A protein has these predicted regions:
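Extracellular interdomain linker/stem segments of modular secreted and single-pass surface proteins
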Residues: 21-28, 181-184
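Extended acidic/polar, glycine-enriched regions
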Residues: 1-24
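The N-terminal extracellular segments of secreted preproproteins, especially immediately downstream
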Residues: 21, 40-43, 251-253
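Short, conserved sequence motifs used for protein processing/export or organelle targeting and
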Residues: 5, 14-16, 62-260
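Local sequence-structure signature of Cys/Sec-based thiol-disulfide redox active-site neighborhoods
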Residues: 25-68
Length: 260
């Protein structure tokens, strides 16, 4: 106690050790936002509109919009369903989101309702967590280049990078690569008075659901070739890549180190 006496109630005391590193400079990280929503979610359009209103000011934000968490729909891919693992075992819901798959419950105890990194998707929550993540340096680089052949609709993708700062678990890092598409129009979106445009929809995962193991200490370089389906609009397609830790027994230990 502040008066040097005994703590009258010591059951609420807790301590946590944190490592602090001082450097002259660091590489700015990109922050990964993974949204979970579906066409059957009546609350999702309002949440999407609110989030879309604040993201233009977030220059370092990378987005993926999984169609899972509340049933599935025409835009769902298997990998998105696999990520329902980040929900508590007793409850899935939408709209929901992950920010860098980070467990930030100690920093924001009022925002996190469950024992996993998943939280309700809202502009307020996003702004708070994005601001905190922008203060964390990138631990690895993620460099992305593409080569598009319009005649064959083939896309070559190169992803490379290396370690920037010490990493606690370098042997458990995985690379994830997605093809996403914007401006997908739906006439069956619950909660929308008319049609609704879906953004950042994963069309294909080029790596397994839980990523491809990479050695960031030696530097990594991966090449992918994919042919875009005829119904995919290449003008609205983009490649998303990120490196994250993977612990198959703990969804709170799968944080993203950097994205592109």
């Amino acid at each position: 106690a502040v008066n040097d006496g005994s703590d009258a109630v010591d059951t609420d005391n807790w301590t946590e050790a944190q490592n602090v590193m001082c450097r002259d400079s660091y590489v700015q990280r990109k922050v990964l936002l993974e949204l979970f929503s579906t066409e059957r979610c009546t609350a999702c359009p309002e949440a999407h509109h609110a989030i879309d209103a604040v993201t233009p000011d977030m220059d370092n934000l990378i987005e993926v919009g999984h169609h899972a968490g509340f049933y599935t729909d025409q835009f769902t891919i298997d990998e998105s369903v696999a990520y329902e693992w980040f929900y508590p075992s007793y409850h899935v819901f939408a709209p929901a989101m992950l920010i860098d798959r980070m467990d930030m419950r100690n920093a924001f105890p009022s925002l996190f309702k469950y024992e996993t990194p998943i939280m309700s998707a809202s502009a307020t929550n996003l702004k708070a967590l994005y601001a905190l993540e922008q203060k964390r340096p990138a631990l690895v680089t993620v460099d992305l280049t593409t080569d598009w052949n319009p005649s064959s609709r083939s896309l070559g993708i190169d992803v490379s990078g290396e370690q920037l700062l010490p990493i606690a678990t370098p042997d458990s890092l995985r690379l994830y690569v997605f093809l996403t598409e914007d401006s997908l129009y739906s006439t069956s979106q619950a909660g929308a008075s008319a049609g609704f445009y879906h953004r950042h929809v994963p069309r294909k995962s080029l790596t397994p659901a839980w990523g491809e193991k990479v050695d960031v200490t030696a530097g990594y370089n991966r090449h992918f070739d994919v042919t875009l389906n005829d119904e995919w609009d290449e003008k609205h397609m983009r490649v998303v890549a990120f490196v994250a830790n993977y612990n198959s027994t703990d969804p709170c230990d799968c944080s993203v180190l950097n994205a592109a």
